[in-house]
Amino acid sequence: MSSVAITPGCVPLSGWRAILAGAAIRLDESCRPAIARAAEAVAAIVTRAEPVYGINTGFGKLATVRIDAADLATLQRNIVLSHAAGTGEPMPVAVARLMMALKLASLGQGASGVRPETVALLEAMLARGVTPLVPAQGSVGASGDLAPLAHMTAAMIGVGACIDEAGTRIPAAEALSRVGLEPLTLGPKEGLALLNGTQFSTAYALAGLFGAEDLLRAALVAGALSVDAARGSDTPFDPRIHALRRHRGQIETARALRDLLSGSAIRASHLVGDERVQDPYCLRCQPQVMGAALDLLRQAAATLETEANGVSDNPLVFPETGEALSGGNFHAEPVAFAADMIALALCEIGALSERRIALLVDPALSSGLPAFLTPRPGLNSGFMIPQVTAAALVSENKQRAHPASVDSIPTSANQEDHVSMAAHGARRLLPMVENAMAVIAIELLAAAQGCDFLAPLRSSEPLERVRARLRAAVPRLDEDRYFHPDLAAAAALVRGGAVVEAAGVGLPGVSGGVA
């Protein structure tokens, strides 16, 4: 198993992706002194008995209520218990672990004032596979992801439940005991520090971002295969066209499409004498649409990388002056905007793919392919309903792509009068990824079927490798059969990265690299 060293403020996107995939996590030792200094600063504030929000006051609208020193531990426990009011299905274990790692990185910067032993417990839970059961609904993305993070913190104090990969639920105290850990007694500010923050929204947004990156690469492969199946032109991918417009994503996706189609005998067969002047937009404008999606994902990636390496607690502790300053870093507007960007990109990637599927099944548009890609149309329906399925999934994603960040609703007796809705905006991304991956899977099957009708002509070497990998899992459709297993098998190849791997061509990604 790979391992990621969390150096607070310095974790690249690749590190967060590895953690989501199950990498082991350890906190870099360099951050330990800062954690201790911030905890000492909080202890000094308690000793001075000066009023500081969240340390010796109530919370939210109750911030003006002073709390006696004898009740400070109860105050922190109470905020956890009262705020653990989430509902809905639990977070996926992988995303919950990513949320915990993000919280660990935030606490490790020494601006939250939690004790070293509190950080050590969270670190040990990650190392020993203790994952809190966190209901996924209940956050509005300000003041932080309170309800979800309260469920995480509840497990740390032995309350609530934990969950494993199989979905088995275990009482939190028992889950801790099984691996030799003891529930935590929270110190001053610690309950608030663990609850305040955008880690729930950021974890979901990162998971959606990484899924979108995988999707975009698979969609480029599918789009190239559709160009050959429809006997389309590669002229629109000429680098001179894209250099004049200057958009980086457009330039890179055009290059990827050229690389994928290079050497295609299908393309060579109609270079001369083809009376079609221009292909439909779904083939011809792939660099413009996919490049714009790539640029949008990169903007979102930059925002999320910054957020993942920042501190979104409140108040923030500055040990050098002994101050605890109240602000609004918990407001997840940057995450909400990033999630909306990802949703728009996901929607458009799927929408363009569905249009290519529609082209391939329509004999009026597909340049000689049989209706619905079946040898005997009429007796067989072929790809008629898979295209309908793709249309349904794309339309569902269009509804989900409505920006979440434009919504707001006042909470906490109007003290928290503007919220980001980042949690909802980020949570919707994984279902959108799944929908879009299913659409790409349908396109791959349709494009491979279309190329089968062009035999003995062959596509390029990269695309022939993709066809071979696809045909190893899904045979050619010569007559109607129960279709669902074909779709499931193709979707599994897309989801698992086998399609991109088979192509063996460098494809652009969100961090500027290729894979």
UniProtKB/Swiss-Prot annotation:
GO molecular function: histidine ammonia-lyase activity
Tree of life domain: Bacteria
Catalysed reactions listed for this entry: L-histidine = trans-urocanate + NH4(+)
Keyword Nuclease: no
Pfam families: Lyase_aromatic
PROSITE patterns per the UniProt record, alphabetical: PAL_HISTIDASE
Alphabetized UniProt keyword annotations: Cytoplasm, Histidine metabolism, Lyase
Pathway: Amino-acid degradation; L-histidine degradation into L-glutamate; N-formimidoyl-L-glutamate from L-histidine: step 1/3
Database matches in HAMAP family: His_ammonia_lyase
Family the UniProt entry places it in: Belongs to the PAL/histidase family.
Record's protein name: Histidine ammonia-lyase
Species this chain originates from: Methylobacterium nodulans (strain LMG 21967 / CNCM I-2342 / ORS 2060)
Native organism taxonomy: Bacteria, Pseudomonadati, Pseudomonadota, Alphaproteobacteria, Hyphomicrobiales
